[in-house]
């Protein structure tokens, strides 16, 4: 029997393993910025006290790189506006090319961190 993907299908993102990855990405974000009470969007650098309006984004896409799905360093924090903007601008190209995230974030210390991860991961 085949099952159809319904509107509640999450492609594994509802799993405890994914939620743990997401939590750890947020913790890493705080550490990168030397903060204890705030989270920071890596694009716009706005500080947030909660993760409610923040997303954990995969540098190497969830779809194309299943072996990197739960690697904590493969995650960055973007506010929902910057995250939506990234996917609107690059659409499916972003699935294949992690360097587009560096281009999108621009030249700041955050893009340097991502560039180093991509370079060291090859």
Task: Give residue ranges: language-model regions.
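Short, charged surface segments at domain edges that flank catalytic/cofactor-binding sites
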Residues: 2-45, 67-69
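Short linker/helix segments within small regulatory modules
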Residues: 60-74
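Short Fe-S-cluster ligation motifs
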Residues: 72-81, 108-122
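Residues immediately within or flanking Cys/His clusters that coordinate Zn2+
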Residues: 38-41, 53, 76
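Histidine-centered catalytic micro-motifs
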Residues: 54-62, 82-86
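Short cysteine/histidine-rich metal-coordination sites, predominantly Zn2+-binding motifs
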Residues: 58-64, 94-103
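Short Cys/His-centered divalent metal-binding micro-motifs
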Residues: 49, 75-97
């Amino acid at each position: 029997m085949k099952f159809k993907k319904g509107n509640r299908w999450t492609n594994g993102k509802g799993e405890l393993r994914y939620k743990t990855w997401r939590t750890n990405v947020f913790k890493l974000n705080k550490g990168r910025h030397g903060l204890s009470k705030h989270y920071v969007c890596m694009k716009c650098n706005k500080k947030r006290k909660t993760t409610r309006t923040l997303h954990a984004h995969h540098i190497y896409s969830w779809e194309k790189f299943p072996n990197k799905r739960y690697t904590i360093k493969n995650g960055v924090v973007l506010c929902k506006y910057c995250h939506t903007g990234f996917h609107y601008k690059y659409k499916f190209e972003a699935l294949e090319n992690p360097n587009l995230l560096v281009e999108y974030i621009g030249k700041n210390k955050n893009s340097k961190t991502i560039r180093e991860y991509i370079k060291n991961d090859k």
